[in-house]
Amino acid sequence: MKLKATLTLAAATLVLAACDQSSSANKSTAQTEAKSSSNNTFVYCTAKAPLGFSPALIIEGTSYNASSQQVYNRLVEFKKGSTDIEPALAESWEISDDGLSYTFHLRKGVKFHTTKEFTPTRDFNADDVVFSFQRQLDPNHPYHNVSKGTYPYFKAMKFPELLKSVEKVDDNTIRITLNKTDATFLASLGMDFISIYSAEYADSMLKAGKPETLDSRPVGTGPFVFVDYKTDQAIQYVAHENYWKGRTPLDRLVISIVPDATTRYAKLQAGTCDLILFPNVADLAKMKTDPKVQLLEQKGLNVAYIAFNTEKAPFDNVKVRQALNYAVDKKAIIEAVYQGAGTSAKNPLPPTIWSYNDEIQDYPYDPEKAKQLLAEAGYPNGFETDFWIQPVIRASNPNPKRMAELIMADWAKIGVKTNPVTYEWADYRKRAKEGELTAGIFGWSGDNGDPDNFLSPLLGSSNIGNSNMARFNNSEFDALLNEAIGLTNKEERAKLYKQAQVIVHNQAPWIPVAHSVGFAPLSPRVKGYVQSPFGYDAFYGVSVDGK
C-alpha cells in the first residue's frame, strides 16, 4: 500500500545520502534519455522522487517502485497482473493444523548483488530472513533504530502483535510462529515492507560505522542492481547477471523524475521515455489514438478519500461528518478530476475486491439535508476549518488540487468556510499521523488483495498515529476485523467485512470519493510489461524492440 503513505522526514535524508555517494562516472539524465532509443536501456518516467530506497522504512508507491519492485525479493510474491501469490525466495512451505506455525523451505543458490560498497561471500540463506524480520520486530536489534526507522507498514499490518517468533531451523529453513491465526499472513509476506535484506551487507556496514548505507544504497537479490541516484533527476540500475529467475532482457533501467505530465507525454512521443506514470487525464483520449503510444488500462485497487479527524471538533460529531458527505457532489468530481478515468466511491473498499458491500446506499448530493444536519449538530450557520490538500498526484487521485477546489466550493454552499493547507509530502503525512489534521485528502492502494488491507490500516484503532488518518476508534468495528482475520472461511469473513463497511458508512469518518482506473502509456515497442492490480511497476521480463 499501495497509501501508499510515507517515510518520516528523518528517514527521507537517506535519499540525499544515496546521492552523496553517487559515482561521477554515471551519465546525466538527459544523456541517458537520449540513449534510450539506441541501446538496451528502459526509461521509466515518473512524477516525483522516491522518499527512500529501504522498503522496511517506507509505505509509499513511488519509493517501492524504486526499491522493492526492482532490487529486492520476498519469501512469496504476487503473480504478474494478479493478487495470487507464488513461491519466490521460499520454494515451498507448510502450515500447521492450528494455523500458527509456518515452515518455509528457502531457495538455494540465490545470489545477492555485488556493488561498490559490498561483495557478498555467500548465497542467500535463513540468516537474511531472520535479520529482515527481527530488525523491525525487536527493539533491541542493532539495526532497529538505524535510519530512525519507525517501520510504519510493519506496524500497520500488526506484525509486532502477530509474530511470536522467527527462527532459523537450518540454513535453508525458517519457521515463523504466530500468536494467533491470521488469514492474511501468507499474502502479507508478498508485500514490499517485508522484502529480504542481506544480513551480511548489514553486518559489514555496521562494522564500518555507516549502518545507514544499508538503507540508502540498497543491495538485494532482485533483477536489477542499484547504481546511482541523482537527486530529483534519475535513478540508475543495471541488470543482475546472476538473478535466480534468469537475467532480465534489459541491460539498464533508468527511473527518470519528470514532474510535469505534459512533459512526460512529450518524452514518450519523442522516444526518450518508454513508460510514463500518472498521465494527464485530459490527454487520455488523444493517447488512445496516438500511434506512438500503447495505452493499457486496469480498474484500480484503490480509493481516494477525505479523512476527518474524529478526535477534533467539529469532526468529533457524527452529524457534522454526515452533513459534509451529503454536501459533496461526487458526480462533478468524477467528471472534472477523473474525466472518465474513475468511478465514485461509497465504501472504503473498491468494488474490485471481494466482500465489497454493494447494498450500501451512498450519501446522495443533498445540500439541504447537509444544512439540516449541521443545524442539528449545533452549527446552523456553518463553521470555519482548515482543509488539507494532498500535495502529490497518486494512483488514486490524478488532481488533488482540483478535487479540493470542488469540495471546498461545495462546502461553502452549506456555510462551511475552508482554509486550504498543504505541506511537502513527507511532512503532510507526518503531521496528519501526529493528529494535526482537521480534514484532508488522502488515498490508498491495496497491497495484497485482501479487504483487511484496507479496513485495518486505514480505520482500525490500533493504527491511530500511523495510517488511520481519521483517528477512527470504534470498538464494534475493531471486533469485526479481529474476528474476520482469525477465520479461514472466505464467505464468513466476507459477512463480517460487509458489516464493518456499514459501520463506516453510518459513522462517516471519511468521505469515500473515488476509485481510479490505472492507465499505463508506454511505447509500442515495449513487450512483456504487465500492469499490477496494486499499482506498482516491476520491469523484470520487459524488453523493448529495437534495443
From Swiss-Prot:
<comment type="function">
    <text>Important role in heme acquisition or metabolism.</text>
</comment>
<dbReference type="InterPro" id="IPR039424">
    <property type="entry name" value="SBP_5"/>
</dbReference>
<keyword id="KW-0449">Lipoprotein</keyword>
<dbReference type="GO" id="GO:0042938">
    <property type="term" value="P:dipeptide transport"/>
</dbReference>
<dbReference type="InterPro" id="IPR000914">
    <property type="entry name" value="SBP_5_dom"/>
</dbReference>
<dbReference type="GO" id="GO:1904680">
    <property type="term" value="F:peptide transmembrane transporter activity"/>
</dbReference>
<feature type="lipid moiety-binding region" description="N-palmitoyl cysteine">
    <location>
        <position position="19"/>
    </location>
</feature>
<dbReference type="GO" id="GO:0043190">
    <property type="term" value="C:ATP-binding cassette (ABC) transporter complex"/>
</dbReference>
<protein>
    <recommendedName>
        <fullName>Heme-binding protein A</fullName>
    </recommendedName>
</protein>
<keyword id="KW-0997">Cell inner membrane</keyword>
<dbReference type="GO" id="GO:0030288">
    <property type="term" value="C:outer membrane-bounded periplasmic space"/>
</dbReference>
<dbReference type="InterPro" id="IPR023765">
    <property type="entry name" value="SBP_5_CS"/>
</dbReference>
<dbReference type="Pfam" id="PF00496">
    <property type="entry name" value="SBP_bac_5"/>
</dbReference>
<comment type="similarity">
    <text>Belongs to the bacterial solute-binding protein 5 family.</text>
</comment>
<keyword id="KW-0732">Signal</keyword>
<keyword id="KW-0472">Membrane</keyword>
<keyword id="KW-1003">Cell membrane</keyword>
<feature type="lipid moiety-binding region" description="S-diacylglycerol cysteine">
    <location>
        <position position="19"/>
    </location>
</feature>
<keyword id="KW-0564">Palmitate</keyword>
<dbReference type="InterPro" id="IPR030678">
    <property type="entry name" value="Peptide/Ni-bd"/>
</dbReference>
<feature type="signal peptide">
    <location>
        <begin position="1"/>
        <end position="18"/>
    </location>
</feature>
